[in-house]
């Protein structure tokens, strides 16, 4: 019946007649607008017919596509677009199913124009806000197809660009349609993100190719507008901007995989650009999630090539700086812990030459210079991220890094690799470099907070090591902490300026907190400066650092007492060069003379005591004439001019402690303290600094002297402590502990299980025993004094002392006066 009615136009359903009337005889004439208005009015008047209209239009479109009647295909899609824009009723869901079916048909076509047409219609549909969204609608096909279009490799460059842009627009439409509706398909699922994100990155990756084309000035705006790279970046920003807390991981993981698969970490330019887009697009409070993803990826690639790891670290550096302005959350120490762990692994790789700890057949050989580059990248990242942290977090990071530095010891095991270097030494150097990066620019008004005791102790104990490079790092770290006004660069060159006002120093009055700090730690600092000056392996950089440290202490932390102590310290350094008990080379002795001259010249002008300045100036002028090798201008140059004989230096060339004490004492300084020579006190860490070879053995001998007989002192032979005696002592102590533990267990068990009467009887017996012992003690201690007249015999035949009162005693005449 329906088939017969279909043959006669008058008997066909009205919606079919209205649909047929919108198609002209010649497709070139386009859509019949008057008939389209009638169809739209009918659809609005009878919404229940909308799904049938869509089904019929879909049927016609599929037929026209099969017959290659592309003009009618375009008309059908235009009609569908207008119906979608006009209708917002509940029945539109069924109509949308037909619409999506037609769009899918166009996207399946091999004709680029039809693919672009279908994409444009889908984008229009995506921009429509539906009143009642459908949760059963699936967009899997569209995600796959649009992603495929993003990777188009058409021979024609212009057509390829159009197809790629259509694919990007389609993905953007899918995101807009689904991302904010929880009832619809979850676009954040990994199976969707693994297609969408790489497709966008693929087009971003070819931005250089697009920019390499140089269009004419008139065509430039059009080309710029049609760039797939810019459209992909805009789509990626929109996608990430809509990401919620739980979706960040699914959005970031495909980025990491894409960079791995296409080896994009090594040039690192594109990777940095990608993560800058990510960090600026996501919500600030989610930034720490991206950092966590990067840290995890760095750990996962711990055995990858050094260039790959360096690229990840560079990206991490850029991302962390951006994240620090938002919310880094609990990842601060986690980030530094990961970076320091990677630093240790890199040191092991460089020493062993492989990722497995030993070189074997088939093992990937590591390039040492690449590992060095990676280590420098890690250190740079540590510094750049730390510079963005607030003061309190930066202090925590400083303490955290210092806790990772291996402690120096007398017997530091040497673990050598191909280069024969000490693993602990390299670790110390790299961690101190990291600490220097973190401390650079660190400003804290309270030095007690900036340099707490536990941190300062560990840092200064490291300063006593034999390695010259480590000592230099420690000095630079101290300078970074103490310099709070940016004066350190003004002391980078050691000189004896006649007027220090040209340096334009920023000087503030010493605060109460600084005074407390110096009272507590000044002697510790002076001792390490003194011992550092005596090191034979010092070079020019060490003396420059020592001069800078002395100068900064004088400017930042000095009061009158500190100034006096610093002058005493420098005069003691002059004595080291003069007496030369350490057998220092000529250069070191000349350097110490020059260091003392430069510092005393500075401190004399800071104190502004005319007589003090005059004495220092006179000695410097005398040295210029008779001994220029004792001044920094001749010593701290590329080719030092030294004296071959420094013995017998005349007193006119030396700064005299008595003279300085006299002139400063007249200006209110403590002259008594100035007269005292500086002598450093040896501490445990100083004894620790006595470097000994690994093969050196220490024999511990314990001598016990018997002091029981004052007339004859008998020396007990020395007991040699061997491995067996130590083992026996440990075993015996363990046995004693076991016995004590068993006794306690029995006591507890007795009080828990024994009846009350038994416990009471036991306690009573102990009380009576205690009383008897006390009585015995009292009888011994409270005994009458002996009688001067002798003893008497008791009734039992035993001699008994008889007590005579003092007033009845008779004393010899010589004892009475």
UniProtKB/Swiss-Prot annotation:
**A GO biological-process term:** social behavior
The membrane topology term of the UniProt record is: Lipid-anchor
Write out the annotated subcellular location.
Cell membrane; Cytoplasm, Cytosol
Its post-translational modification remark reads:
Palmitoylated at its N-terminus, anchoring the protein to the plasma membrane.
The job of this chain, per UniProt, is described as: Component of a complex required to localize phosphatidylinositol 4-kinase (PI4K) to the plasma membrane. The complex acts as a regulator of phosphatidylinositol 4-phosphate (PtdIns(4)P) synthesis. In the complex, EFR3B probably acts as the membrane-anchoring component. Also involved in responsiveness to G-protein-coupled receptors; it is however unclear whether this role is direct or indirect.
Q: How does it assemble?
A: Component of a phosphatidylinositol 4-kinase (PI4K) complex, composed of PI4KA, EFR3 (EFR3A or EFR3B), TTC7 (TTC7A or TTC7B) and HYCC (HYCC1 or HYCC2).
Q: What is this protein called?
A: Protein EFR3 homolog B
Q: Which organism is it from?
A: Homo sapiens
